[in-house]
């Protein structure tokens, strides 16, 4: 199982998760995309949320899948899951133990299960647990997606420090847009220096699909 998080919201988790799953499936690795918690959605009027896109891809493998099969807690408020849950369904806290059981059931059917978190690793799910806690309970490998803008160095290093301190199996990958010429002169020079000294280098997502698939499967 691979848990995909990000250095912050809007870093491109969903885009990268879909690209990686498409690559894996093209290589013969049956891969499903799950997003157990999604906020800021209205399924009545918006059929293009992250989970709707996941469902579209997943149905190439199993036409019987529904939205509720791959996303279990859905909230209209665009906020941390804890805040959305307390405002919209105060008497029904998110049950992470139930989440884990439902997510792990997919490992019986698929070669690779990709689980996308909401926001970054420290986003609260309950008063006691955050996204990192969920990944730890799942015993999943972790892929953190970074944006490619100014500030990515600090964001990547903070996540690297957090994950390294927990002695986890993780990779950090930069979601590099085609039109971001500034990245190569502003941020890449330090990333290259960091990688020379690190035994867990930061990679460019678009250039590393084969490596990331191998990481997820090992």
From Swiss-Prot:
<dbReference type="GO" id="GO:0004141">
    <property type="term" value="F:dethiobiotin synthase activity"/>
</dbReference>
<keyword id="KW-0093">Biotin biosynthesis</keyword>
<feature type="binding site">
    <location>
        <position position="116"/>
    </location>
    <ligand>
        <name>Mg(2+)</name>
    </ligand>
</feature>
<dbReference type="InterPro" id="IPR027417">
    <property type="entry name" value="P-loop_NTPase"/>
</dbReference>
<comment type="similarity">
    <text>Belongs to the dethiobiotin synthetase family.</text>
</comment>
<keyword id="KW-0436">Ligase</keyword>
<dbReference type="GO" id="GO:0005524">
    <property type="term" value="F:ATP binding"/>
</dbReference>
<keyword id="KW-0963">Cytoplasm</keyword>
<keyword id="KW-0479">Metal-binding</keyword>
<feature type="active site">
    <location>
        <position position="35"/>
    </location>
</feature>
<keyword id="KW-0547">Nucleotide-binding</keyword>
<comment type="pathway">
    <text>Cofactor biosynthesis; biotin biosynthesis; biotin from 7,8-diaminononanoate: step 1/2.</text>
</comment>
<dbReference type="GO" id="GO:0000287">
    <property type="term" value="F:magnesium ion binding"/>
</dbReference>
<feature type="binding site">
    <location>
        <begin position="116"/>
        <end position="119"/>
    </location>
    <ligand>
        <name>ATP</name>
    </ligand>
</feature>
<comment type="function">
    <text>Catalyzes a mechanistically unusual reaction, the ATP-dependent insertion of CO2 between the N7 and N8 nitrogen atoms of 7,8-diaminopelargonic acid (DAPA, also called 7,8-diammoniononanoate) to form a ureido ring.</text>
</comment>
<dbReference type="InterPro" id="IPR004472">
    <property type="entry name" value="DTB_synth_BioD"/>
</dbReference>
<feature type="binding site">
    <location>
        <position position="39"/>
    </location>
    <ligand>
        <name>substrate</name>
    </ligand>
</feature>
<feature type="binding site">
    <location>
        <position position="14"/>
    </location>
    <ligand>
        <name>Mg(2+)</name>
    </ligand>
</feature>
<protein>
    <recommendedName>
        <fullName>ATP-dependent dethiobiotin synthetase BioD</fullName>
        <ecNumber>6.3.3.3</ecNumber>
    </recommendedName>
</protein>
<feature type="binding site">
    <location>
        <position position="52"/>
    </location>
    <ligand>
        <name>Mg(2+)</name>
    </ligand>
</feature>
<feature type="binding site">
    <location>
        <begin position="176"/>
        <end position="177"/>
    </location>
    <ligand>
        <name>ATP</name>
    </ligand>
</feature>
<keyword id="KW-0460">Magnesium</keyword>
<feature type="binding site">
    <location>
        <begin position="10"/>
        <end position="15"/>
    </location>
    <ligand>
        <name>ATP</name>
    </ligand>
</feature>
<dbReference type="GO" id="GO:0005829">
    <property type="term" value="C:cytosol"/>
</dbReference>
<comment type="subunit">
    <text>Homodimer.</text>
</comment>
<dbReference type="GO" id="GO:0009102">
    <property type="term" value="P:biotin biosynthetic process"/>
</dbReference>
<keyword id="KW-0067">ATP-binding</keyword>
<dbReference type="Pfam" id="PF13500">
    <property type="entry name" value="AAA_26"/>
</dbReference>
